[in-house]
Amino acid sequence: MSGGTEMAGRFHGRRVLVVGGAHGIGAACAARFARDGAQVAVADLDVEAARATVEKLEGSDAGQDVAVQMDMTDRSSVDAAVAEVVEHLGGLDVLANVAGGDDTGYPPFEDLDDETWARMLDWNLLGAVRTIRAALPHLRASDHGAVVSVSSVNALMAFGGPPYSAAKLGLLAVTKNLATEFAADGIRVNAVAPGTVRTRVWGEDGKDSEQMRHMYPLGRVGEPEDIAAAVAFLASDDASWITGHTLPVDGGVLLRGPGPGTLG
């Protein structure tokens, strides 16, 4: 799944929407899809950053790429953004749900109020539900419909952060159920579960991620491009007989377990 010229063009003619594509993993996904020949739409609450990401895209259809504003916690915003993307691209073949995160700071359980739980569920679970619902009619019209959502290793093992972990585990349950329901439409639904990735959250300067390196059997934390490669694989025809599954992209951390500290 690593980058390579042999993969170039495998998304030629495909229309891809990356939700949460302005920064980090989302921006890497947008770049990977564009490099592999797709027309790419980048949706993000920060539309200026989304436009900056689109301007950097390189690929055969780069001139047709578009940035749109989307607040995934607001159904009307999601519906309007997807409609704008479909109007611009002429349809939709792939939905990559990358947006989400955890801003709780991992407090003790008793300090997590209902509002925090609701915010984490809205951001990390219901947002993806909204985007899938809005995209579904257009994915049904595609011959290559695929949904790939970014979950977390927190959904698979206890690394801390119960609200975030519960939301990401819920996303995996949605993935399995929709894979079954959408199979008759030819739509595949899968997810990836990253470990710690070097993004703005974990310190792009390397300080925070260096402190966590010891937790990973492969000796490093992930890069956004590691996750983008897995997302692109699951969205591609190379995974045409894979649906309803979650692919850990975690440097082997699930083999070792939580150990000291927590992950995000």
Q: Where do the model's predicted regions map?
A:
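Alpha-helical segment proximal to the catalytic Tyr-Lys
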Residues: 137, 180-184, 240
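Short C-terminal tail/terminal secondary-structure segment
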Residues: 2-7, 106, 232, 243-264
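Canonical Rossmann dinucleotide-binding motif of NAD(H)/NADP(H)-dependent dehydrogenases/reductases
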Residues: 9-41
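Active-site loop of short-chain dehydrogenase/reductase
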Residues: 14, 62-64, 90-92, 139-152, ...
